[in-house]
Amino acid sequence: MLPLSPSYDAIVVGSGPGGASTARELALRGLRVLVLEQGGAEPLQGTVTQMAAMAAVPGKGAYVHRDASLLVAGITAGGSSAINFATAAPPPKAMFERHGIDLAPALAALRAELPMAPLPDTLIGPMAARMMAAAQAMGLDWRKLDKMIRPAACRSGCWRCVYGCPFGTKWT
């Protein structure tokens, strides 16, 4: 239970990757941090029904962009990382270098701490395998993307990542 008159040095809104990372950095510096999350913290079940309840609510988790594309935000603990495919991509190096910012040490520290690596071949789904074969047949450079998962806990053939992994495989 929270104290009656809580005192915090920082309040972070959202527990997705951005909010969680910000809260972590502030806490590591000794600050008292409160994280506010609009969604719940129910255990992920990996079902379409649960995913729809936390991400497909118009005006809350689902938005139609002016180009008619659907933007989906996870309204749950872990934010959108709970309902997406755990793809990890580094920020554009050149953009930061133009401002004199070297991200290499921070990226190396993240890689050492987080489960970030290309998806093992045994976990490549049939559609991704078909895309890879087609790209390679055309002479294109197709590479597996880094994922933030724990491969040992992943179930081959499950493909429930987008619904919210019920096995705790994804780093969310």
Give residue spans per PLM region.
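N-terminal glycine-rich phosphate/pyrophosphate-binding loop and immediately adjacent elements
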Residues: 1-99
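Conserved redox-cofactor binding core of oxidoreductases
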Residues: 102-172
